[in-house]
């Protein structure tokens, strides 16, 4: 179906190839799993197989790629190739350009000249598959990260291509949504589709996979069956693609002060008729490490955007360090609260990695040798020491995620809020990220993070807040946490996949989109 022969690729003026001497044949009807560390070359491989490197990006290309025995260079650009190969990338936002979800899904079908009746049938089926029918008239950029991924997936499924490539396409989905994707992919495979899943967390799909490709530094390190891959722990743990942390479910609560750093009283947030937050009462104390869990659209991101004033209460009251957010300028609040967005690209706008970090430091008056020291320390903490002069958009998704964290921790806010901080990170990097959070906590910072990852919660977090439909339904110490709700728990996926469409609450986590917020604002710059 797709064959790569002695294929190597180097981006632009880069000195090191992103892919080196790749030899791989993807068979018709196969479900291939591709995994590896951040920056291993996974996304580049997806771009190569879809013909995007040849027809859109350019760069130094060696060897060849063929689709159905025809060199991809011979196709009439992406327009022709996309009739056969559908791709969903890790950054769903980059694929969403229309004003409503329905238009987003219709657009590809219209471009292919399908009759209206056929377009209606396909789009309805795709939206039902992805449980987003209730979002059909919503603006994609106003949806939560997980909802955006579902829309991008539905738009691609509607095209009914022979090949489907998913590049970290479930990274921001809750466990119910991942189970639904599992069910859909199984049906597509049974129908003879060729599917390529590129992900750090392939364990969710090993049951239906045919082969596993392990990438390391742009090269294929191993190709194995799923059973061989899981039976030999060296393939997983030696490359640190599974978590190696010991469970720490009896972590103590770290309340070191009587006065909360965050106080939320009777907080309600409405957007027209949509109730996004429903009468929330909550206190977070200095020195705590808190996780906020919940399904896509449960209100998690809406809640934490109140912690630095990006959102103002519809009713109720939020205070940060005693400052009421409804009356205190955001520029003042961000001195106390650092927020790392779910999508790191919404925070990155400078020409180099070091300039990204320096931007926030300059805004809070840190300059000269002190700024240099802060930059070097934050880069070392997130393991990006060798990337100071790199253009941020040339980093992998995982590296961009770590850079966004570095930009915030360099400013040393008392409260650090991270929205899905391990998205795009493999297990080793996720563990390292959480060890960093523990270190920052020990230095006196308060840490609040939104996550779907139950393993991370079990290993590192002291207190768990669970949300449903805009309400806090559980607030407990880790050791007492019920484990209910939408979290990524491995046992959820093995052999017990529901065939029913999972309904989702209409509440959007990002009704006020990250894109509508000035990037400079969260790092002490001008707030629009």
UniProtKB/Swiss-Prot annotation:
Belongs to the ABC transporter superfamily. Residues 2-242, 262-494 form the ABC transporter domain. InterPro entries: AAA+_ATPase, ABC_transporter-like_ATP-bd, ABC_transporter-like_CS, ABC_transpr_CbiO/EcfA_su, ECF_ABC_transporter_ATP-bd, P-loop_NTPase. PANTHER family: ABC TRANSPORTER ATP-BINDING PROTEIN MA_1418-RELATED, HEAVY METAL TRANSPORTER. Probably part of an ABC transporter complex. Responsible for energy coupling to the transport system. GO terms for molecular function: ATP binding; ATP hydrolysis activity; ATPase-coupled transmembrane transporter activity. Its EC number is 7.-.-.-. It is an enzyme of class 7 (translocase). This is Putative ABC transporter ATP-binding protein MA_1418. It comes from Methanosarcina acetivorans (strain ATCC 35395 / DSM 2834 / JCM 12185 / C2A). It is a peripheral membrane protein. It is found in: Cell membrane. ATP 1 binds at residues 36-43. The keyword Iron-sulfur does not apply. ATP 2 binds at residues 294-301. It holds the Pfam family ABC_tran. Keywords: ATP-binding, Cell membrane, Membrane, Nucleotide-binding, Repeat, Translocase, Transport. GO terms for cellular component: ATP-binding cassette (ABC) transporter complex. Its main location: membrane. It comes from the Archaea.
């Amino acid at each position: 179906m797709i064959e790569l022969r002695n294929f190597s690729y180097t981006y632009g003026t880069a000195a090191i190839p992103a892919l080196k001497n790749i030899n791989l044949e993807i068979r018709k009807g196969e479900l291939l799993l591709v995994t590896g560390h951040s920056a291993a070359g996974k996304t580049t491989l997806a771009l190569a197989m879809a013909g995007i490197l040849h027809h859109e990006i350019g760069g130094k290309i060696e060897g060849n790629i063929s689709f159905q025995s025809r060199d991809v260079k011979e196709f009439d650009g992406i327009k022709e190739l996309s009739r056969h190969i559908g791709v969903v990338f890790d950054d769903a936002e980059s694929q969403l350009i229309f004003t409503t979800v329905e238009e987003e899904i219709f657009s590809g079908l219209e471009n292919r000249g399908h009759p209206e009746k056929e377009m209606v049938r396909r789009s309805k089926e795709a939206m039902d598959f992805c449980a987003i029918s209730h979002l059909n008239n919503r603006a994609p950029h106003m949806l939560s990260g997980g909802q955006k991924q579902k829309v991008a997936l539905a738009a691609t499924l509607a095209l009914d291509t022979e090949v489907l490539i998913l590049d970290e396409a479930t990274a921001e989905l809750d466990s119910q949504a991942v189970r639904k994707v599992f069910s859909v992919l199984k049906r597509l495979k049974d129908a003879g589709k060729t599917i390529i899943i590129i992900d750090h967390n392939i364990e969710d799909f090993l049951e239906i996979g045919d082969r596993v490709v392990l990438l390391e530094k742009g090269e294929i390190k191993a190709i194995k069956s799923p059973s061989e891959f899981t039976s030999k722990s060296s393939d997983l743990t030696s490359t640190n693609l599974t978590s190696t942390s010991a469970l720490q479910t009896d972590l103590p609560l770290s309340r070191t002060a009587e006065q909360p750093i965050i106080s939320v009283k009777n907080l309600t947030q409405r957007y027209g008729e949509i109730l996004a937050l429903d009468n929330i009462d909550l206190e977070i104390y200095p020195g705590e490490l808190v996780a906020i869990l919940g399904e896509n659209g449960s209100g998690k991101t809406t809640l934490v955007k109140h912690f630095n004033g990006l959102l103002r209460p519809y009713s109720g009251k939020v205070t940060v360090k005693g400052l009421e957010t409804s009356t205190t300028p955001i520029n003042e609040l961000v001195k106390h609260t650092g927020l790392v967005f779910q999508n790191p690209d919404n925070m990155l706008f400078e020409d180099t990695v070091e300039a990204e970090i320096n931007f926030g430091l300059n805004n809070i008056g840190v300059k000269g040798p002190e700024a240099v020291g802060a930059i070097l320390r934050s880069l070392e903490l997130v393991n990006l020491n060798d990337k100071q002069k790199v253009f941020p958009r040339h980093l992998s998704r995982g590296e961009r995620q770590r850079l966004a964290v570095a930009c915030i921790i360099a400013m040393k806010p008392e409260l650090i809020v991270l929205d899905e901080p391990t998205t795009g990170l493999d297990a080793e990097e996720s563990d390292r990220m959480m060890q960093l959070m523990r270190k920052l906590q020990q230095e006196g910072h308060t840490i609040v993070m939104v996550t779907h990852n139950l393993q991370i919660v079990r290993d590192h977090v002291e207190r768990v807040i669970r949300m449903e439909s805009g309400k806090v339904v559980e607030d407990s110490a880790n050791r007492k946490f019920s484990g209910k709700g939408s979290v990524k728990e491995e046992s959820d996926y093995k052999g017990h996949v529901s065939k029913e469409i999972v309904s989702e609450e209409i509440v959007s986590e990002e009704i006020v989109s990250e894109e509508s917020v000035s990037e400079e604002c969260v790092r002490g710059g001008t707030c629009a």
